């Protein structure tokens, strides 16, 4: 909204333009001898007005003055046309001269017009006779002029309606009718109707398609309107029902009823009530959400990541529950359409659900929904802030407290603590070793025997909820060369997958490993062995961890009975672990590493262990980034403990001698 507006007074000679201005600022009447008054500014503090107001007096006499008046008409925020109620010709001059002049000078840039009949103190029978024609002409103006036209009568001598004149000028600028309402057709504009429908959905907290008494009063309170009693609401409902039968149902006002109530406010005018409602929901003068609301400023320092805060997670959880129409714990396609109806569009491509936890029908679970928004926040928090606004979130800090700023892994290492709630893991491996299955198993997807190679230009990625308030991103990378710059800036952990039956697949990840070391990327590394069912000697697959991860589905559907020897399968019926000299030699010379087994035929604790690797690396900056034990930490602890014990022994002997 503007801090100040410019109002210009025009009209025939001797109608009292200057007298109106003088009486208003001096609060008394006096005869004015000069033809025009200098510009007057009325501060906002005066009478608690909406804003400061500049009032321009005009006089149509001579070429220079006329040019000056025309310039003021072009730039005025509101135009007051004054006529004298005791001279009907000055009123007719509005139709014949002043309205055409305004249309000529303003073109499509219309401004609100206030038609003012001055000298009301001189009203006589003749004026009353002309009043019907005046009212009909005013109605004609309103139907032909595409902006607000208001009409009132006043007296500069008795001060009658002078404050109303200023108020009408200000409200016509700040609450423009044409943006919301077509008076000629008695209907809302499309933009107004669209905005009010969105507000209706935001206030419909239980998403039942109607506004209850509680929800109506939530709307009233948020907009600064007076709350209503049950009796008042029932009276309005009865009135709405008498006009539109489907405007009210057993639960309250329907969307049609809500729109009809606002149409009545617009019909009565001015539009202040509806504008106040719209601005309370952060709409600007063009019925677009405020830029500062949709795109608030969040300063994210270098080497930091973003994720939803606890407040942000709670908001999206409540959003999920609101739009879960049948309370079955998932969002159907119908639910998603309803959810995003308050936004311009769904911000992701079709099929985005496959990257997150869903039910068997690909409907997002709550875990999947929260993972989706945490991943979005991690990759581009600005989109999250934008959609928080579309979903109606509004906090004291303009939604930026919905986002948490986290240290990068490098900063965690420096501070010797693990602070992040999200870990980004890159998964490398040769073709057909089971990378996609490794990702899909994490988010509970069913195993498929069909092999579909991942497109090298579209690396597959999933995100899931691993532990309390912890999220893991798994990004499948296809290619023999590591993306050094990307890994350096984004990667927290590298997973190297190989088929235990294929030396060639191990050579592939050994090459990746060597590149990581050559580039001196200080990133933890985990080796993962696939297609091996003999895990008896591997303590990493302890079934006691079955209950630790709600995202991991037990896909042990008699899969071991499927004697499909297709190499595209990520399991094998061979009970013996296929090893080779190349693989054995590597792990003998790299004792910090011990391969972990992955199998879809059992619940895996491997994803938890990957997170533990990250946590340990934050406390133990090992350049090898191994998934081995913290022997150095233990040794340090033992040395310190022995030292303390020795000091204690010497001290006790000393005291004994004393």
From Swiss-Prot:
Example of a GO biological process term: regulation of cell shape
Subcellular location(s) per record: Mitochondrion outer membrane
Ranges where the Miro domain occurs: 2-175, 420-616
Coiled-coil region(s): none
Disulfide-bond pairs as recorded: none
Pfam families given in the database record: EF_assoc_1, EF_assoc_2, Ras
Gene3D superfamilies: EF-hand, P-loop containing nucleotide triphosphate hydrolases
Molecular functions per Gene Ontology: calcium ion binding; GTP binding; GTPase activity; protein kinase binding
InterPro entries: EF-hand-dom_pair, EF_Hand_1_Ca_BS, EF_hand_assoc_1, EF_hand_assoc_2, EF_hand_dom, Miro, MIRO_dom, P-loop_NTPase
GO annotations of cellular component type: cell projection; cytoplasmic vesicle; cytoskeleton; ERMES complex; mitochondrial outer membrane; mitochondrion; plasma membrane
Name the UniProt record assigns to this protein: Probable mitochondrial Rho GTPase gemA
Naturally occurring in which organism (per UniProt): Dictyostelium discoideum
